[in-house]
UniProtKB/Swiss-Prot annotation:
Its job: Required for maturation of 30S ribosomal subunits.
Keyword tRNA processing: no
Cellular localisation: Cytoplasm
Principal subcellular localisation of the protein: cytoplasm
The family this protein is said to belong to: Belongs to the RimP family.
Keyword Cytoplasm tagged: yes
Name the record gives this protein: Ribosome maturation factor RimP
A cellular-component GO term for this protein: cytosol
Higher taxonomy: Bacteria, Thermotogati, Deinococcota, Deinococci, Thermales
Name of the gene: rimP
């Protein structure tokens, strides 16, 4: 994929391991996927979803938090103190894989940037996502952009 999943590290000391991989190894056995890892100003934010695509529960997040804490304590990758936040993706969930766009087909997504737009996800064709933007279709190659869900489905997907 041309664009890595969202891992952001801003300011404060050097992080000595791949936090994405560390978190992924901690939560994958729990049936969870990592959507985002962001470290900034003493906070490590982790957003997760269930692999079975059912809604994530507070119990899922609590268990994931315990497993992530254990992995962080074992590896000690972040110098100094920090706060761990483990969350569900929420209403502005990131979309960046083929599976994400297929799962939320028919819903609106926001693509940020200078030429950004909000459009309905029509379909995935090959390596492209096709959006309906006004009266026209726009195609973007998966892995070259990021998007966020701009509306929430009536039923869990």
């Amino acid at each position: 994929m041309g664009v890595n999943p969202p891992f952001l590290c801003e300011g404060g000391g050097e992080v000595t391991v791949d936090l994405w991989q560390l978190v992924e190894e901690a939560v994958s056995p729990l049936g969870l996927d990592v959507l985002e890892v962001h470290f900034a100003r003493g906070e490590l934010l982790v957003r997760l979803e269930r692999k079975d695509e059912r809604p994530i529960t507070v119990a899922d997040l609590e268990e994931a938090s315990r497993h992530i804490e254990a992995a962080l304590d074992r590896e000690d990758p972040i110098p100094g103190s920090y706060r761990l936040l483990v969350e569900s993706p929420g209403p502005k969930r990131p979309l960046f894989t083929r599976r994400h766009f297929e799962r939320f087909q028919g819903l609106k997504a926001k693509v940020p940037g200078p030429e950004g737009f909000t459009g309905r996800i029509l379909r995935v064709e090959g390596e492209e996502v096709v959006f309906q933007v006004g009266d026209e279709e726009r195609r973007l190659r998966i892995g070259t952009f990021r998007a966020n869900l701009a509306e929430w489905p009536e039923e869990p997907r």
